[in-house]
Amino acid sequence: MRSIRSFANDDRHVMVKHSTIYPSPEELEAVQNMVSTVECALKHVSDWLDETNKGTKTEGETEVKKDEAGENYSKDQGGRTLCGVMRIGLVAKGLLIKDDMDLELVLMCKDKPTETLLNTVKDNLPIQIQKLTEEKYQVEQCVNEASIIIRNTKEPTLTLKVILTSPLIRDELEKKDGENVSMKDPPDLLDRQKCLNALASLRHAKWFQARANGLKSCVIVLRILRDLCNRVPTWAPLKGWPLELICEKSIGTCNRPLGAGEALRRVMECLASGILLPGGPGLHDPCERDPTDALSYMTIQQKEDITHSAQHALRLSAFGQIYKVLEMDPLPSSKPFQKYSWSVTDKEGAGSSALKRPFEDGLGDDKDPNKKMKRNLRKILDSKAIDLMNALMRLNQIRPGLQYKLLSQSGPVHAPVFTMSVDVDGTTYEASGPSKKTAKLHVAVKVLQAMGYPTGFDADIECMSSDEKSDNESKNETVSSNSSNNTGNSTTETSSTLEVRTQGPILTASGKNPVMELNEKRRGLKYELISETGGSHDKRFVMEVEVDGQKFRGAGPNKKVAKASAALAALEKLFSGPNAANNKKKKIIPQAKGVVNTAVSAAVQAVRGRGRGTLTRGAFVGATAAPGYIAPGYGTPYGYSTAAPAYGLPKRMVLLPVMKFPTYPVPHYSFF
């Protein structure tokens, strides 16, 4: 199933199509005026009939209830010949569309409607209408349809049908055989089936208002499909009550509200699945007491044609061609492709322009906070007209063709330190960094500083490799110039506050992370956030750490940089220069437990030598081997032992005597 967002294009097409078929405000106002006028006129006709029958004027009697659509009217209404008038069909359901505005009302009678009553109402209705409005209406009777037809004489042309019926007609059909019949029907009784259909339409209107009106997009989809039934003859048999049932079942069974495009697609999926075909579930009519198939009037060929057409429409929708189903022109994209020219002019005056797509085109509705931060940063930089070039790019623009050389590579594998150099006008500049790219960037910063160019935070945008990005908490850290060999340029505030701004990670002179190196010397240190200032795009954090009773502060654009700055300040104050020897922490060798305690202690003392404080990373002495396991080097199968490594011994590796312990015999099984 497509994602929710993928239906946005379908929603746009459906809503545009709906706006073209929805009646205009003038048409809706004309419908409301005509229906209200006829309803009020029929009420006056009812009053006139009661006066004629009783011979007295009864204007204070109960008015006709318009909103009640009940068929089981009580016997106390026996004084009125006309019990009430109700709206049915498109007027009651709100499904009117252009060029298809059939207006219908039901006039409920106390007794079974006759031709005589129809003529009486038809003759008196124009008189009552003239009392209510100056507009001219044509009133005709249609005995075959058991109705009165009313037409207006001005644009828009509207036709209103008033159908006469009575609850007694349905009650009589439900009586069982053998029950007494109250009286014989009059000879001029109107068509019984037409009256029954009017009662069914009344039930349909009540059901629709209760079940379908509250469903999101249901009424919109019904208007779209009614227009489809008018345009495509294949769909014409489905128009009316069956279409309303299918839409309500298709949309109402979803566990969430649907947009117009997705709701239309769901209805098409339901029809394309073959529910109309013979052998299918059929379409139950909920407004009938007995089980009734609402599709019983359709032929097998009609059902197959509608199913085939729905499958074709579903394929078109799946391939983004719903406009063909709606018979409309495709709409342009909601995000038009535009080309912008970003020109970069160098100092020599040569300019170059490149056509690129707008920055916002690739964003869409992505909720990634990093992308949102990048978008905000781009807007800020564009507004300030800042040239997006780091120090290396700027130096290459000023002095093209410079050759960078790798002087040395030191440090452990997990934290290497590269030293790069460049020769500018006979002067050699050197700088270090965790990668060649960062070292070159630091060299460029030094050269620009020597040449007098600004290299502040706002101008130098961070350019780091993917390995360095993984070490940062935020992808948008932007810090400016300083390298490990240029720590003297860092600024120190009151209370030993140090703010270091570098192109890459903050490192000590030995190429380590300041926080890690300080943790090796003093464990259990706690860093506290002192302050947080600046806007969302230019934050400044101040962190504080207490070491040996002294507090050191560091500042940076994020907490990690501020923490490293504080640690670097502590290292420079306490563990550099003459303070290094006094503050060096003695390391204690943990006493080994078990049988090997004495032997291990002796071995450690033997290899310690000239004041070596402790063992380096290396040898591990295990405890006594557990029963059932073979200790390395003692009775090991296949001749393996704890001999020296195949590639020789490391220079600083500590060798310990191998302790041999007796173990339980382990049986060896042979399967050959």
Swiss-Prot record:
The modification Asymmetric dimethylarginine is found at residues 612, 617. Residues 357-371, 466-476 have a biased composition (Basic and acidic residues). Residues 52-73, 349-371, 466-499 are annotated as: Disordered. Residues 5-363 form the DZF domain. Residues 387-453, 510-576 form the DRBM domain. One of its GO terms (biological process) is mechanosensory behavior. It comes from the Eukaryota. Involved in spermatogenesis and sperm function. Plays a role in regulation of cell growth. Binds to double-stranded DNA and RNA. Binds most efficiently to poly(I:C) RNA than to poly(dI:dC) DNA. Binds also to single-stranded poly(G) RNA. Binds non-specifically to the mRNA PRM1 3'-UTR and adenovirus VA RNA. This is Spermatid perinuclear RNA-binding protein. It comes from Homo sapiens. The lineage of its organism: Eukaryota, Metazoa, Chordata, Craniata, Vertebrata.
